[in-house]
Amino acid sequence: MGLTSSEYAEVCYDFWVGGGDFVKNDEPQANQDFCPYDKMVKYVKQAMDKAVKETGKKKVHSFNVSAPDFDTMIERCEMIVNAGFEKGSYAFLIDGITAGWMAVQTLRRRYPGVFIHFHRAAHGAFTRKENPIGFSVLVLSKFARLAGASGIHTGTAGIGKMAGSPKEDITAAENILSLFAKGHIFSQSWARVPENDKDIVDLVKEDYAHHIILEEDSWRAMKKCCPIISGGLNPTLLKPFIDVMKGVDFITTMGAGCHAHPKGTRAGAAALVQACEAYQKKISIEVYAKTHKELAEAIGFFSKAKNLKQVNDPKN
């Protein structure tokens, strides 16, 4: 927020040439006086073309097409479709809660080949436990999949800054990726474990979060929906998050976790890629950082920021 169209496109370019793949508008970014939508699309296209030429790798941008009315939403979609992007290099981000389910379904039916990115801004009004008549993150995620979303934010499973328990977020992610469910929650073995056996209770609750729980819940006719993870993550938290999720079948979008790198966005993207490489090679990021300066700088910066936050925490 706050960048002009060309400045925003420059940040996209820096992320892409740093090794990143997927850039998104955030939920409040649309058509602004200082960042007109048409110019933003134009400059992002130029930045993407340059990054693809330099890296030899495909890149993706998710454009926020949310609008106060139907005509404007479609106008933005058509602007992107006609901008000359390669197929598969753009997505439509829709604020599904505020724009409404009709907007999500309209995008899916009009643009069957486009990745529909469901941003869940304002979901907390429904999914937080403080609301006695709301619904869970699992229900929201399944609604989004049913409406045709290709991906939806599912939370950070207790690792990032987003509210939500690991069990809640993992269950949502697992369910929108599944095609068929069998076995009701109350028939699972963990339901009969004595409550005073904490070790076993913890084990089976973790197992529960990673398995399908709804019996009459076949999704064989529905395409999978990709979990999108964002909110308070950075390169030092990538492995802890993957360990909790027990898999890498997700998209992660890091804002400050990338742009706040001491050397800027390009170095932040490189640090994230290096953290991923370390995980794939089963090397700790501390060891991998000895030969990868961007990752070393990220570890130093985010570790310092974490310690400062703990010192300033009024609970301490």
Residue ranges of model-derived segments:
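Aromatic/hydrophobic pocket-lining residues that form the small-molecule binding cavity
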Residues: 8, 37, 41-44, 73, ...
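Glycine-rich, proline-tolerant flexible connector loops at the mouths of alpha/beta enzymes
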Residues: 20-42, 156-163
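Extended, intrinsically disordered, low-complexity segments
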Residues: 165, 187-206, 265-316
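Conserved, mostly hydrophobic/aromatic
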Residues: 15, 241, 272
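Flexible, glycine/charged-enriched surface loops at secondary-structure junctions
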Residues: 22-27, 31, 51-58, 185-193, ...
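Active-site-proximal, glycine-rich beta->alpha crossover segments in alpha/beta enzymes
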Residues: 1-20, 27
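N-terminal active-site wall of soluble small-molecule enzyme domains
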Residues: 52-61, 68-81
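Catalytic alpha/beta core domains of metabolic enzymes, predominantly
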Residues: 75-77, 84-254, 263, 267
